[in-house]
């Protein structure tokens, strides 16, 4: 290390070994960090790490790609820094831990941006061109933000889902799952956003409160004789009345095609002034009260007896086109928790309705589907044609009132599906889409996709463990995956479909490979510009190009295929060791990646999943613009330093919500300063130490040095076990405790006298420095994953010839003989020292002494404490930082205690100890004998401290 002594202070006649270091007390992080970012970039530090790690066992943390749109926010910072800490910790643990960042580039948000800037009438080719340019610009902006946070990775060669190689890889992945038999086309209700004009993935749906009119509606008897028989009656007392349903979606009434009852629920035939009403028996009292009616139950029967009975559509008298009947089907999903116990079924607009009607033989062509993709009814729909469904709600209520079939209406606030992009309500809408079948058995295994995925979850490690059940439940209960989207900026489902039959071309798999080869050279634009005749020849007139694009979750969900084993196969590998994202990704990237890998490989693409929580303010509130409680990581980095953000993340239990506020950041900053001060002390007191020249073997060390190194080695083992389990907050807590209590509050405090006052090249001082050298080596490496800037800054002073701390591995501490016994002994000694410190403080408050060195102490001790204290001999006073110390043996703990007296001797000018031999040498009347020996003689001898 460079020897930089403090030359600004006047030289004392009796100098001490007070050294300095270029490592400043003030971090000045906002100024210094960008310099390190620049240096790491210019010196290609990431590439240096890769070269140093070559040949080691790989550790692959596969980056879940953020979307290439907008500035990075605090959630991005949490995610990327957690990944960075893990990758750095694994590199230091001796792995070749590669980090290739990625970006998700296709999809609606970018397409919306292009529409906003250039309108909706751009030709497809221009949309593609501008979308690529926009995504590239956003990626470069985000890249700068991530680098500023100290995240090291292959920033010059990231993966992008819009790279031609990756787009082609997705098409090949699609071909593979088609070849295995997972993909089918069908009419099904899917999440549909009117603003997107497209189907949505489950992960693109969020729930917010919405107020709608609820209605109780009467479907009048169409088969009174059969109804009477079902209730065990010869005839109905009268034919007026019918069955009553309750719904929160009046707009679905025009498309009603069935009624659902639970087979085991008991239904009552109730005589009222509005006629005979069929209601679930459990709901009769509540419903009649709501309708303002009184009634008598005439008969009861289980739902199973009412199956296939028919009732008239409630708008039959309002317009002839509604003169149809709705049959009763049975459904286990019907409950009596609310409503009437009868569910009206519009198969085009409900998954359960659809499944029920299909199970009872309804064909796709029979399904009534009057709502268009923009949310308006088709013009030909009687009474409501051309209206948006939301605008039609009150008109439908009015029409039912006029038809005499409205029993009741009121406004109802409920949690309802919304598009996560547009924040507008969405619906289930039956459309012809391409699906991956969850319960399809492919042609290469007898297990369904659902079964394969669930088995994969069982074989995956989860951090924290609760993530397992969450993902398991989602997979167990999810519907088929809607793969297709109706947009432009996305990877095409590059099929040729027969114009008359709708069938795929018989050479579809071969054609997909042909398209993939073109896309690999020219991007997805190659499909847009492709003339079918190029691939189909004379058959081209019979086929049309499928216009659907792949769900963007298929883009990112297949990165294990087109990145790990595609664009970056030389750096990465399959399966990844770890996927790490926020808890929302159980229904997002974790989910889609599991499904695609289960289809392609029969196993998950990851060995472990790590989930982190979301950021909240100091009061636990979600951050939002309306509350004004958002914190910008860029602003914090420029004001306090990215290191403070990193330390905050590392010190917070990420398995729950991560709370942040100015007060929290203030506490983190104070903690950072304590760590920095510890490093400064270590570096300053090692600035005249050259390991090759000055290091002393363990047998030359004083006992307290051996203890400190054994304690450091124990700490390292403890911390490495936490790193192994991706637990960072215990690492920070233990390092901070070590710095403030074990080092600052004890070892370094005791060491100052030896470092400053013994001869510069004495065995005692060099032994202390050797211990400090090992402690510094260990400490810097242990903190490097989270305090990356600070560790690198200190490292370049500590080991100036080393390229970077990140090519190192964790320090190999020298073995300390009988370390366990030593640790136990010094635990006793430190407890005794705490008692002495307390007694000294009481003496100071009583004005008996000033500093602790003005004191002489007598300790009464018994048993093991007595043995430990007396074993230190004359060095005990150094451990206690007093001028003298003696130990008196007593028989029991009850008799133990500490007596403090003020020393009657003079104070040494140099070491500040009060000693009888101060002035013993006439030529140096202000020196004690110890300092005289250290300066002019052979030096004092120490054994313990």
Curated annotation (Swiss-Prot):
Segments carrying motif 'HIGH' region: 66-76
SUPFAM superfamilies xref list: Anticodon-binding domain of a subclass of class I aminoacyl-tRNA synthetases (SSF47323), Nucleotidylyl transferase (SSF52374), ValRS/IleRS/LeuRS editing domain (SSF50677)
Residues annotated for L-isoleucyl-5'-AMP binding in this entry: 581
Reactions that this protein is recorded to catalyse: tRNA(Ile) + L-isoleucine + ATP = L-isoleucyl-tRNA(Ile) + AMP + diphosphate
One BP annotation, GO: isoleucyl-tRNA aminoacylation
Cofactor binding remark: Binds 1 zinc ion per subunit.
Any GO molecular function: isoleucine-tRNA ligase activity
InterPro entries for the chain: aa-tRNA-synth_I_CS, aa-tRNA-synth_Ia, Anticodon_Ile_BEm, Ile-tRNA-ligase, Ile-tRNA-ligase_type1, Ile-tRNA_ligase, M/V/L/I-tRNA-synth_anticd-bd, Rossmann-like_a/b/a_fold
Residues the entry annotates as binding ATP: 625
Motif annotated as 'KMSKS' region, chain positions: 622-626
PANTHER family to which the protein is assigned, alphabetical: ISOLEUCINE--TRNA LIGASE, MITOCHONDRIAL, SOLEUCYL-TRNA SYNTHETASE
Note on domains (UniProt): IleRS has two distinct active sites: one for aminoacylation and one for editing. The misactivated valine is translocated from the active site to the editing site, which sterically excludes the correctly activated isoleucine. The single editing site contains two valyl binding pockets, one specific for each substrate (Val-AMP or Val-tRNA(Ile)).
Described function: Catalyzes the attachment of isoleucine to tRNA(Ile). As IleRS can inadvertently accommodate and process structurally similar amino acids such as valine, to avoid such errors it has two additional distinct tRNA(Ile)-dependent editing activities. One activity is designated as 'pretransfer' editing and involves the hydrolysis of activated Val-AMP. The other activity is designated 'posttransfer' editing and involves deacylation of mischarged Val-tRNA(Ile).
Protein name from the UniProt record: Isoleucine--tRNA ligase
């Amino acid at each position: 290390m460079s020897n930089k002594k403090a030359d600004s202070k006047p030289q004392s006649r009796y100098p001490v070994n007070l050294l300095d270091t270029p490592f400043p007390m003030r971090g000045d992080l906002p100024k210094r960090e960008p310099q390190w970012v620049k240096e790491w970039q210019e010196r290609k530090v990431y590439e240096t790490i890769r070269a140093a790690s070559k040949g080691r066992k790989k550790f692959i943390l596969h980056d879940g790609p953020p979307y290439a749109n907008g500035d990075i926010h605090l959630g991005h910072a949490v995610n990327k820094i957690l990944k960075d800490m893990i990758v750095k910790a694994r590199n230091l643990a001796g792995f070749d831990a590669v980090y290739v960042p990625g970006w998700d580039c296709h999809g609606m948000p970018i397409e919306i941006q292009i529409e906003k800037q250039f309108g909706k009438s751009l030709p497809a080719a221009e949309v593609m061109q501008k979308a690529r340019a926009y995504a590239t610009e956003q990626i470069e902006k985000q890249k700068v933000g991530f680098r500023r946070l100290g995240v090291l990775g292959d920033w010059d060669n990231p993966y992008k889902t819009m790279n031609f190689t990756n787009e082609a890889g997705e098409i090949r992945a699609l071909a593979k799952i088609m070849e295995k038999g997972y993909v089918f086309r069908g009419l099904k209700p899917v999440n549909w956003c009117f603003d997107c004009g497209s189907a949505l993935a489950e992960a693109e749906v969020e729930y917010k409160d919405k107020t709608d009119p609820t209605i109780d509606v009467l479907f009048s008897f169409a088969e009174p004789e059969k109804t009477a028989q079902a209730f065990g009656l010869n005839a109905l007392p009268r034919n007026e009345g019918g069955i009553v349903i309750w719904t929160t979606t009046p707009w679905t009434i025009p498309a009603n095609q069935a009624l659902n009852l639970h087979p085991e629920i008991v239904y009552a035939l109730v005589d009222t002034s509005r006629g005979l009403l069929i209601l679930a028996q459990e709901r009769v009292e509540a419903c009649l009260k709501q309708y303002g009616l009184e009634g008598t139950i005439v008969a009861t029967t289980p739902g199973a007896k009412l199956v296939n009975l028919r009732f008239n559509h409630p708008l039959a008298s309002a317009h002839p086109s509604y003169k149809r009947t709705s049959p009763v089907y049975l459904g286990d999903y019907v409950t009596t928790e609310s409503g009437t116990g009868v569910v009206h079924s519009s198969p085009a607009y409900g998954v359960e309705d659809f499944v029920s009607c299909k199970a009872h033989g309804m064909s796709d062509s029979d399904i009534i589907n009057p709502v268009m993709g923009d949310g308006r009814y088709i013009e030909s729909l009687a009474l409501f044609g051309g209206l948006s469904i939301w605008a039609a709600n009150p008109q439908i209520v009015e029409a039912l009132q006029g038809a005499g079939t409205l029993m009741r209406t009121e406004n109802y606030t409920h949690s309802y599906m919304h598009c996560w992009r547009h924040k507008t309500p969405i619906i289930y809408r039956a459309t012809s889409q391409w699906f991956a079948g969850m319960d399809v058995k492919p042609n290469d295994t007898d297990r369904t996709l659902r079964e394969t995925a669930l088995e994969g979850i069982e074989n995956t490690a989860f951090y924290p463990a609760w993530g397992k059940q969450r993902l398991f439940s989602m997979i167990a209960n999810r519907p088929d995956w809607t793969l297709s989207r109706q947009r432009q900026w996305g990877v095409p489902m590059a099929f040729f479909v027969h114009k008359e039959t709708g069938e795929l071309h018989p050479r579809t798999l071969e054609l997909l490979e042909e398209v993939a080869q073109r896309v690999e050279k020219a991007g997805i634009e190659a499909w847009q510009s492709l003339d079918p005749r190029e691939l189909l020849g004379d058959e081209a007139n019979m086929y049309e190009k499928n216009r659907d694009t792949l769900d963007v979750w298929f883009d990112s969900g297949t990165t294990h295929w087109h990145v790990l084993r595609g664009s970056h196969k030389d750096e990465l590998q399959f399966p990844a060791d770890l996927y790490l994202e926020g808890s929302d990704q159980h229904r997002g990237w974790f989910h889609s990646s599991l499904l695609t890998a289960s289809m392609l490989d029969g196993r998950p693409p990851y060995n472990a999943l790590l989930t982190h929580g979301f950021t909240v303010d100091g009061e636990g509130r979600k951050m939002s613009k309306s509350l004004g409680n958002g914190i910008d990581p860029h602003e914090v980095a420029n004001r306090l330093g990215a290191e403070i953000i990193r330390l905050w993340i590392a010190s917070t239990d990420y398995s729950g919500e991560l709370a942040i506020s100015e007060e929290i950041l203030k506490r983190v900053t104070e903690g950072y300063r304590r760590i920095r001060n510890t490093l400064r002390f270590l570096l300053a007191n090692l600035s005249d130490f050259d390991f090759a020249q000055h290091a002393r073997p363990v047998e030359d060390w004083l006992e307290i040095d051996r203890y400190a190194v054994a304690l450091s080695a124990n700490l390292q083992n403890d911390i490495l076990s936490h790193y192994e389990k991706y637990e960072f907050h215990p690492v920070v807590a233990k390092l901070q405790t070590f710095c403030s209590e074990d080092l600052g509050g004890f070892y370094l405090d005791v060491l100052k006298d030896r470092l400053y006052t013994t001869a510069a090249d004495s065995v005692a001082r060099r032994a202390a420095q050797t211990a400090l050298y090992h402690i510094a080596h260990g400490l810097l490496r242990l903190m490097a994953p989270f305090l990356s800037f600070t560790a690198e800054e200190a490292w370049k002073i500590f080991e100036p010839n080393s390229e970077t701390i990140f090519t190192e591995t964790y320090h190999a501490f020298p073995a300390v003989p009988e370390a366990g016994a030593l640790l136990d002994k010094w635990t006793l000694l430190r407890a005794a020292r705490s008692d002495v410190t307390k007694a000294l403080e009481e003496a100071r408050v009583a004005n008996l002494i000033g500093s602790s060195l003005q004191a002489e102490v007598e300790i009464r001790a018994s048993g093991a404490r007595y043995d430990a204290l007396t074993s230190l001999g004359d060095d005990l006073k150094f451990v206690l930082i007093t001028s003298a110390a003696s130990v008196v043996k007593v028989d029991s703990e009850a008799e133990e205690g500490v007596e403090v007296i003020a020393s009657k001797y003079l104070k040494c000018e140099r070491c500040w100890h009060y000693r009888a031999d101060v002035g013993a040498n006439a030529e140096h009347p202000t020196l004690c004998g110890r300092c005289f020996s250290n300066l002019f003689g052979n030096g004092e001898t120490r054994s313990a401290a």
